[in-house]
Amino acid sequence: MPQQTIEELYEQALERKQNPQTGSYTDYLYQKGLDKILKKVGEESTEVILGAKNNNEELIYETSDLLFHLMVLLVEKGVSLDDIKDELGSRLGKKSLLHERADWRGDKKNEKDS
């Protein structure tokens, strides 16, 4: 089975933005604009969660849809994969800020006594 990399998927989304193909789904998303793209990213995120609860086949399918829509979003916003890779690289070996917050575990450290 042929495979496609994230980079290829991004390049495909970029190509479709630069050279629209009338009638294509990708062109439809770009024509509708950011709000439509964001709505689709939200829908696909939910479907990934539901797919994960069901089975791996559904998880893989829905994750592929989400990745496609994320690439369209990145292109729409002018964010490159290198921007994402740089951000990920900047996090290597660093403790997440989330771990410094008490509420990430549900602790009520900052809650006032009643």
From Swiss-Prot:
Q: Which organism is it from?
A: Leuconostoc mesenteroides subsp. mesenteroides (strain ATCC 8293 / DSM 20343 / BCRC 11652 / CCM 1803 / JCM 6124 / NCDO 523 / NBRC 100496 / NCIMB 8023 / NCTC 12954 / NRRL B-1118 / 37Y)
Pathway(s) the chain acts in = Amino-acid biosynthesis; L-histidine biosynthesis; L-histidine from 5-phospho-alpha-D-ribose 1-diphosphate: step 2/9
Compartment list: Cytoplasm
Q: Which UniProt keywords apply?
A: Amino-acid biosynthesis, ATP-binding, Cytoplasm, Histidine biosynthesis, Hydrolase, Nucleotide-binding
Q: Which GO terms describe its cellular component?
A: cytoplasm
Q: What is this protein called?
A: Phosphoribosyl-ATP pyrophosphatase
- Pfam families for this protein: PRA-PH
Name the gene behind this protein. Answer: hisE
Kindly state which reaction or reactions the protein catalyses.
1-(5-phospho-beta-D-ribosyl)-ATP + H2O = 1-(5-phospho-beta-D-ribosyl)-5'-AMP + diphosphate + H(+)
Q: Which PANTHER family match?
A: HISTIDINE BIOSYNTHESIS BIFUNCTIONAL PROTEIN, HISTIDINE BIOSYNTHESIS BIFUNCTIONAL PROTEIN HISIE
Tell me where the transmembrane regions lie. none
